[in-house]
Curated annotation (Swiss-Prot):
Recorded GO MF terms: protein-lysine N-methyltransferase activity
EC number per UniProt: 2.1.1.-
UniProtKB keywords: Cytoplasm, Methyltransferase, S-adenosyl-L-methionine, Transferase
Subcellular location: Cytoplasm
Family membership noted in the UniProt record: Belongs to the methyltransferase superfamily. PrmA family.
Record bears the keyword Signal: no
GO terms (BP aspect): methylation
Gene Ontology cellular component annotations, sorted alphabetically: cytoplasm
Record function comment: Methylates ribosomal protein L11.
The protein, known as: Ribosomal protein L11 methyltransferase
Length: 299
């Protein structure tokens, strides 16, 4: 007989996500999922896009479930008003078969073509590449980013246009998708760094699955030796500005710096933050509300 799960869905103020997620993990003994929270972007500003978020947790449907649901409802009613929701809706419960829970989300992912050559493909999807296609396989169930968000697409398109015959540094590598693309586009050496060791572990698994070699480390940016033909950073706008000097220092003479993860409304803030670096703003590309800045260093 198939095992079943109780999927508990809560509609809460976005600012309450961390508080509720911690409570749900403790209450259920399992992880949680958050709907409509982009995994490929790193801007805290996006929290304002949807003031209400959907958080889902998964419980074993045992004799204690009703008691746990009552405790959850009390927790939401007690804390939500402090986050601006005076009358939060009670959580809802749906029964799922284990197979549905484990694989149902896969229907939302399909092979995605980016630029002229790059294709991001879920591991389970059949795909017949065209001549010249550079295919990157990802399992979004384990990855920190799937490559489908505009910030990542803008980075990948800029990287493809530049070509990567030299060395590439990927700052905030996440799932490693940009690092893998750089290798497949012909980079001689690729270094990916991330402050999160879990992200680095995932990136290493993804690189191994795709048969590519990249140096993936948790080394702070300032401590990474050498300079690079291309430096990529798809991170918080505030962090881009804070790290402007260190990012610039890693760009080789004549090299390029690609900055993404920037909301269009924050574009001028980032540009102003790089005025003193001596880099030249060579190109600005946008997709929807997102912006990507391409800088070049002097010779």
């Amino acid at each position: 007989m198939d095992k079943t799960w109780a999927e508990v869905t809560c509609e809460i103020p976005a600012a309450m996500i961390d508080l509720l997620a911690d409570f749900l993990v403790e209450l259920s003994g399992n992880g949680v999922s958050i709907d409509n929270l982009e995994l490929d972007t790193f801007s805290l500003d996006t929290m304002d896009e949807a003031p209400v978020k959907t958080v889902r947790a998964y419980f074993t449907p045992d004799d204690e479930l009703e008691e746990k649901l009552a405790a959850l409802n009390r927790f939401i009613q007690e804390h939500a008003p402090a986050y601006g929701d005076a009358a939060p809706a009670p959580p809802t419960v749906t029964t799922l078969r284990e197979e549905d829970w484990a694989t149902g989300w896969r229907q939302h992912f399909a092979p995605t073509r980016i630029g002229r050559k790059l294709v991001i493909k879920p591991t389970w999807e059949p795909f017949s590449p065209e001549p010249g296609d550079l295919v990157i396989e990802l399992d979004p169930g384990m990855a920190f980013g799937t490559g489908t968000h505009p910030t990542t697409r803008l980075c990948l398109e800029a990287l493809e246009k530049l070509g990567t015959a030299g060395d590439v540094l990927d700052v905030g590598t996440g799932s490693g998708i940009l690092a893998m693309a750089a290798v497949k586009l012909g980079a001689q050496r690729v270094v990916g760094t991330d402050i999160d060791p879990d992200a680095v572990a995932v990136a290493r698994e993804n690189c191994a699955m795709n048969g590519v070699t990249a140096e993936l480390v948790t080394t702070p940016l300032a401590d990474i030796p050498g300079q690079f033909s291309v430096v990529l950073a798809n991170i918080l706008a505030e962090d881009l500005v804070r790290m402007a000097a260190d990012l610039t220092a890693k760009v080789a003479p004549g090299g390029f710096l690609i900055l993404s993860g920037i909301l269009v409304e924050r574009e001028s803030y980032v540009i102003d933050g790089f005025v003193s670096t001596g880099l030249t703003l060579a190109e600005t590309t946008r997709e929807g509300e997102w912006s990507c800045l391409l800088y070049q260093a002097g010779q």
